[in-house]
Amino acid sequence: MKGLGGFHLAGRCDDPEIALTLRRRKHRDEKPFAVMCRDAEAARIFCEVSPEEERILSGARKPIVLLRKKDPRSWQHLSENSQIGVMLPYTPVHVLLMEEHDGDPGFGALIMTSANLSDTPIIRENGSAVSGLRGIADGFLLRTRSTS
Protein backbone atom coordinates (compact mmCIF):
# COMPACT_ATOMS: atom_id res chain seq x y z
CA MET A 1 0.00 0.00 0.00
CA LYS A 2 1.49 3.31 -1.08
CA GLY A 3 1.52 5.93 1.68
CA LEU A 4 2.91 9.45 1.82
CA GLY A 5 6.54 8.49 2.48
CA GLY A 6 6.76 5.06 0.90
CA PHE A 7 5.05 1.69 0.92
CA HIS A 8 3.53 -0.30 3.77
CA LEU A 9 2.70 -3.96 4.02
CA ALA A 10 -0.72 -4.27 5.64
CA GLY A 11 -2.70 -7.16 7.04
CA ARG A 12 -5.40 -7.95 9.55
CA CYS A 13 -4.24 -8.04 13.17
CA ASP A 14 -6.78 -10.57 14.33
CA ASP A 15 -5.14 -13.46 12.46
CA PRO A 16 -1.75 -14.49 13.93
CA GLU A 17 -0.95 -16.39 10.72
CA ILE A 18 -0.88 -13.10 8.79
CA ALA A 19 1.70 -11.68 11.21
CA LEU A 20 3.77 -14.87 11.03
CA THR A 21 3.67 -14.77 7.22
CA LEU A 22 4.82 -11.14 7.22
CA ARG A 23 7.63 -11.97 9.65
CA ARG A 24 8.79 -14.86 7.48
CA ARG A 25 8.65 -12.87 4.24
CA LYS A 26 10.38 -9.80 5.72
CA HIS A 27 12.91 -11.80 7.73
CA ARG A 28 11.68 -9.92 10.80
CA ASP A 29 11.48 -12.51 13.54
CA GLU A 30 11.15 -10.36 16.65
CA LYS A 31 10.79 -6.65 15.90
CA PRO A 32 7.29 -5.46 16.91
CA PHE A 33 4.74 -4.51 14.28
CA ALA A 34 2.78 -1.26 14.52
CA VAL A 35 -0.96 -1.20 13.95
CA MET A 36 -3.39 1.26 12.40
CA CYS A 37 -6.71 1.70 14.19
CA ARG A 38 -9.73 3.45 12.69
CA ASP A 39 -9.74 6.06 15.48
CA ALA A 40 -8.79 6.55 19.14
CA GLU A 41 -12.01 4.85 20.22
CA ALA A 42 -11.00 1.71 18.30
CA ALA A 43 -7.52 1.87 19.85
CA ARG A 44 -9.15 1.92 23.31
CA ILE A 45 -10.53 -1.57 22.69
CA PHE A 46 -6.99 -2.94 22.94
CA CYS A 47 -4.95 -0.21 24.63
CA GLU A 48 -4.96 2.35 27.40
CA VAL A 49 -5.19 5.78 25.74
CA SER A 50 -4.64 8.86 27.89
CA PRO A 51 -6.06 12.24 26.82
CA GLU A 52 -2.52 13.38 25.91
CA GLU A 53 -1.89 10.22 23.85
CA GLU A 54 -5.22 10.73 22.07
CA ARG A 55 -4.29 14.35 21.31
CA ILE A 56 -0.99 13.22 19.76
CA LEU A 57 -2.56 10.27 17.89
CA SER A 58 -5.32 12.45 16.45
CA GLY A 59 -3.12 15.45 15.63
CA ALA A 60 -2.26 16.56 12.12
CA ARG A 61 1.00 14.57 11.97
CA LYS A 62 -0.60 11.19 12.86
CA PRO A 63 2.58 9.68 14.38
CA ILE A 64 2.97 6.17 15.70
CA VAL A 65 2.39 6.37 19.46
CA LEU A 66 3.48 3.65 21.89
CA LEU A 67 0.39 2.69 23.89
CA ARG A 68 0.14 0.31 26.83
CA LYS A 69 -1.86 -2.81 25.99
CA LYS A 70 -4.85 -3.45 28.27
CA ASP A 71 -3.75 -7.07 28.44
CA PRO A 72 0.04 -7.45 28.07
CA ARG A 73 -0.53 -10.95 26.63
CA SER A 74 -2.79 -9.69 23.85
CA TRP A 75 -1.41 -9.29 20.36
CA GLN A 76 1.71 -11.29 21.28
CA HIS A 77 2.07 -12.13 17.58
CA LEU A 78 2.50 -8.39 16.92
CA SER A 79 4.52 -7.29 19.93
CA GLU A 80 5.79 -9.26 22.90
CA ASN A 81 6.12 -5.98 24.82
CA SER A 82 3.48 -4.52 27.13
CA GLN A 83 3.19 -1.65 24.64
CA ILE A 84 2.38 -1.51 20.95
CA GLY A 85 2.86 1.20 18.32
CA VAL A 86 -0.50 2.58 17.20
CA MET A 87 -1.27 5.04 14.43
CA LEU A 88 -4.46 6.43 12.96
CA PRO A 89 -5.31 6.79 9.26
CA TYR A 90 -3.39 9.69 7.73
CA THR A 91 -4.41 9.61 4.07
CA PRO A 92 -7.86 9.43 2.45
CA VAL A 93 -7.05 5.91 1.21
CA HIS A 94 -6.29 4.78 4.78
CA VAL A 95 -9.61 6.27 5.95
CA LEU A 96 -11.50 4.44 3.19
CA LEU A 97 -9.72 1.19 3.99
CA MET A 98 -10.63 1.44 7.67
CA GLU A 99 -14.24 2.42 6.87
CA GLU A 100 -14.53 -0.64 4.61
CA HIS A 101 -14.32 -2.79 7.74
CA ASP A 102 -16.66 -0.65 9.85
CA GLY A 103 -19.03 -2.95 11.71
CA ASP A 104 -16.94 -6.09 11.12
CA PRO A 105 -16.86 -7.53 14.66
CA GLY A 106 -13.61 -9.42 14.09
CA PHE A 107 -11.78 -6.40 12.75
CA GLY A 108 -10.00 -4.02 15.08
CA ALA A 109 -6.87 -2.83 13.34
CA LEU A 110 -4.40 -3.46 10.55
CA ILE A 111 -0.76 -4.37 10.83
CA MET A 112 1.15 -1.57 9.10
CA THR A 113 4.84 -2.14 8.54
CA SER A 114 7.32 -0.59 6.17
CA ALA A 115 7.47 -2.56 2.94
CA ASN A 116 11.24 -2.32 2.64
CA LEU A 117 13.31 -5.19 3.96
CA SER A 118 15.69 -4.59 6.88
CA ASP A 119 18.68 -2.43 5.98
CA THR A 120 17.31 -1.51 2.54
CA PRO A 121 16.20 1.95 1.34
CA ILE A 122 12.56 3.00 1.47
CA ILE A 123 10.68 2.02 -1.68
CA ARG A 124 8.99 5.10 -3.15
CA GLU A 125 8.13 4.27 -6.78
CA ASN A 126 5.34 2.00 -8.02
CA GLY A 127 7.57 0.02 -10.39
CA SER A 128 10.20 -0.55 -7.71
CA ALA A 129 7.51 -1.74 -5.31
CA VAL A 130 6.00 -4.20 -7.76
CA SER A 131 9.37 -5.67 -8.74
CA GLY A 132 11.04 -5.46 -5.31
CA LEU A 133 8.13 -6.80 -3.28
CA ARG A 134 7.24 -9.71 -5.54
CA GLY A 135 6.96 -12.73 -3.26
CA ILE A 136 6.54 -10.53 -0.18
CA ALA A 137 3.27 -8.69 -0.91
CA ASP A 138 0.17 -10.58 -2.02
CA GLY A 139 -1.20 -7.53 -3.84
CA PHE A 140 -0.59 -3.84 -4.41
CA LEU A 141 -2.60 -0.69 -3.76
CA LEU A 142 -0.86 1.91 -5.93
CA ARG A 143 -1.53 5.54 -6.80
CA THR A 144 0.11 8.04 -9.11
CA ARG A 145 0.92 10.70 -6.49
CA SER A 146 4.65 10.87 -5.72
CA THR A 147 5.88 10.04 -2.23
CA SER A 148 7.82 12.64 -0.27
Where are these regions (language model features)?
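Active-site-adjacent structural elements in enzyme catalytic cores
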Residues: 1-148
